[in-house]
Amino acid sequence: MRYRPFGRSGVVLSALTLVVGDEIARRGQDKTAALVTQALEHGINGFHIKTAEPDAALAVGQALAVLERRLLFVSLRLGFGRGRTGLVRDFSPEALMQAVEQTLRLSNLGHLDLVILDDPGEEELPLRSLTALKSLRSAGRVTLLGVAGHNDAMDAYLSTGAFDVLATPYSVTSGWKERNRMRAAVEQDMGILAYDWFPEELNSPQKIEKVEGQKRSFFGKLFKEPDPFEGIGGYSFLHRTSNWTAEDICLAFTLTEPAVASAWIETADPDRLDQLVAVPDRDLPPGLGAQIEMARFTAGRQQAG
């Protein structure tokens, strides 16, 4: 496992962070703890609690108790709570503070290294909620405040200077919007976490062909002359690279971005976890970076057209 500095926090974070989400939490406390332990054995020291299931916090605390707390980096998603019909969005100060205190009580972690607001809209986060989070930080209950999302409100939140961390989608298909947002975060010395690094539209050759075929059909109707770039680029090579899966390529590409401290990985499958943790120590095959850039260029050209 490789490790990277995390913004201005002074923390050294593993290149991969295990997300403890609903899928693994539904399998019970013992299996959740076993997966966290497996991640620890692979050298992962970052863990993100994404689920509101109480058993998840219990399991994470149980598994992490074997290591010194200072060697670990544990974060919590905020902005969702349990309602009568399931999860509901809730960025009220009461909900945020309750989520933090419940997680700390169940996990016995002492403090959370990071709390992350999950994709808040521009008018969705009251000022008093931000004040409540700052009070938790002042009290030593949390260390860093972060914001995650892909909507345009992220730019407004970054401009406030109130946050230490940006969690953002970043993949082989990401464009200038994501890159500019990451650059703005770097200029503020923020830590950057990446997620959604394997876009759904790329997870099978059939999906890639469907999307790219639709684009070829659309642009063929716009132009009378043949497109000089037709047949060049495209992402089908992701599923034709020897000794690499498309998922592994996409993860490895995201980790080539120097601004990204860690990529979130979410799986309940121990075998898949074993596969993913091997990626940070691998180098992309020669020429693959150029293929990715050509595919990005072709996709960007089609969107601009």
Which residue stretches match the model-derived regions?
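Conserved, mostly hydrophobic/aromatic
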Residues: 6, 18, 47, 60, ...
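Short, well-ordered coil/turn segments that N-cap beta-strands
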Residues: 11-16, 43-45, 68-72, 109-113, ...
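Glycine/proline-rich, positively charged
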Residues: 27, 88-176, 180, 256
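Structured C-terminal cap/extension of enzyme domains
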Residues: 38, 45-48, 64, 180-305
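N-terminal binding-site loop/beta-alpha segment at the start of enzyme catalytic domains
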Residues: 1-73
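Active-site mouth loops of central-metabolism enzymes
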Residues: 17-30, 81-97, 238-241
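Active-site beta-loop-alpha junctions enriched in small/polar residues
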Residues: 21-23, 50-52, 77-81, 117-120, ...
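Structural motif corresponding to the early beta-alpha repeats
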Residues: 66-94, 118-119
